[in-house]
Amino acid sequence: MKDKLIVFDTTLRDGEQSPGASMTREEKVRIAKALERMRVDVIEAGFPVASQGDFEAVQAVARSVRESTVCGLARALGADIDRAGEALAEAESARIHTFIATSPIHMKRKLRMEPDQVLEHAVKAVKRAREYTDDVEFSPEDAGRSEIEFLCRILEAVIAAGARTVNIPDTVGYNLPEQFAQLIRTLRERVSNSDKAIFSVHCHNDLGMAVANSLAAVMSGARQVECTINGLGERAGNAALEEVVMAVRTRQDSFPCDTNVDISQIVPTSRLVSGITGFSVQPNKAIVGANAFAHASGIHQDGVLKERQTYEIMSAEDVGWHANQMILGKHSGRNAFRARLRELGIELETEEELNAAFQRFKELADKKHVIYDEDLQALVTDANLAAENERFKLSWLKVVSETGETAIASVTLSVDSIERQASAPGSGPVDAAYKAIDSILQSNTELLLYSVNSITSGTDAQGEVTVRLKKNGRIANGQGADTDIVMASAKAYVNALNKILYPVERAYPQV
């Protein structure tokens, strides 16, 4: 029987460190529930000591998730660990993940500690975490640049203190696959009590090696991989969950282990994370990119038509891709709508959410004669993009634009439940709409990114707009979808403004 490879998802913690990817409490819970449906083993929900908002988000995930272990991150400090323990108190299965830096440069320049002091802090942290849960994980930050002798000493000490999992992070993505594999082999051989703990890896993608390093470590005995949906993460990102899982599943001839992940949930969860964070998935992204299973070459197309396995090493349907087919129309009922959402891996938690989504579906069906799966996913995502405690809502928009003339936009916004109106000229319909919104909110933000993607084909297709705003060093993403591209643009802008003008303050550490 093959070993189990534990999948530890840190989209809600490390993934959220991507500039502009901040999530509200409700959005975190929605993603956590999707990860639970995917049968992810461990969900790292956040860093509870960072802020009251993050504490409440971890607490909400702990209350909502029953099948997966919920994890909270904590530095090797008593206050951090206590806060994590409090946030996880109602979890069905809880883990505290504590860490301290072990590389010479970090110990000297950042911690200003001697190695023996670092070891002492690590042991105390693990023992304190064990007061809250038996499931404790320890990470030596920047392990990839740490001295092997000290790394062995500290791992041996924390395992003896009660750590069930020891995680080896390549914090700055510096290692190459064979180097990282050798590091894991060496640690497992030289740490005398290594058989008492699961070895885990957490790889960053600065050199494009995160997935390769993770898989090399698995081949060397690691039995937990820390990763994120779509590879989301700070700088160049983290190891992509979908790539790690499908590499192990597809190459069972080479790997001595497998995961419990329900791979049919990969694409729906990828789209959910993309919609909530505003980070689009590149078309050529493995597994979840729009072109991942597209064949342009005539020879390839001919081969696939004759036998799919000639050029496809996995099935698109297996990972959650569905044919671009007409499925519903304006005469479709509520039960058919609910059933199709479930087939797409979309679960609405309450009847109120279902009713609201169904109403939006009916409105869309009046505009479009053909409704595709992609339309439904965009519709549900768009319905859930509202920021927590949303203060601004787009009530009405009218734009007049003629050839050779300046566009004029008139906007009505609900600001703290009070309707406010404004009009403004612009160099085009979108510019005019944004200026009208700005004249109401006086936002003084900088537009860093504006992009439009067609959700489906056809002249009546929905457009999905992504914007990225910057204000006082903060960055926020927003998304909106509509058959009217100007309306989609205004929705995305208001969505981003809700996030950037009233953000949740966080101060995450990096592991």
Swiss-Prot record:
Major localization class: cytoplasm
Q: Which is a Gene Ontology cellular component entry for this protein?
A: cytosol
Q: Which domain of life is it from?
A: Bacteria
Transmembrane annotation, as ranges: none
* Cofactors demanded by this protein: Mn(2+)
Q: Where is this region: Regulatory domain?
A: 393-511
Instruction: Name its pathway.
Output: Amino-acid biosynthesis; L-leucine biosynthesis; L-leucine from 3-methyl-2-oxobutanoate: step 1/4
GO biological-process terms attached to the record: L-leucine biosynthetic process
Q: Subunit arrangement?
A: Homodimer.
Protein name, please?
A: 2-isopropylmalate synthase
For the Pyruvate carboxyltransferase domain, which residue ranges apply? Answer: 5-267
Q: Tell me the organism's taxonomic lineage.
A: Bacteria, Pseudomonadati, Pseudomonadota, Gammaproteobacteria, Chromatiales
Entry GO MF terms: 2-isopropylmalate synthase activity; acetyl-CoA C-acetyltransferase activity; manganese ion binding
Which residues are recorded as binding Mn(2+)? D14, H202, H204, N238
Which family, according to the similarity comment? Belongs to the alpha-IPM synthase/homocitrate synthase family. LeuA type 1 subfamily.
Q: Where in the cell is it found?
A: Cytoplasm
- UniProt-listed Enzyme Commission number(s): 2.3.3.13
PANTHER family xref list: 2-ISOPROPYLMALATE SYNTHASE 1, CHLOROPLASTIC-RELATED, HOMOCITRATE SYNTHASE-RELATED
Please report the organism this UniProt entry assigns to the protein.
Nitrosococcus oceani (strain ATCC 19707 / BCRC 17464 / JCM 30415 / NCIMB 11848 / C-107)
- Give the keywords, sorted: Amino-acid biosynthesis, Branched-chain amino acid biosynthesis, Cytoplasm, Leucine biosynthesis, Manganese, Metal-binding, Transferase
Q: What is the purpose of this protein? A: Catalyzes the condensation of the acetyl group of acetyl-CoA with 3-methyl-2-oxobutanoate (2-ketoisovalerate) to form 3-carboxy-3-hydroxy-4-methylpentanoate (2-isopropylmalate).
Q: Which reaction does it catalyse?
A: 3-methyl-2-oxobutanoate + acetyl-CoA + H2O = (2S)-2-isopropylmalate + CoA + H(+)
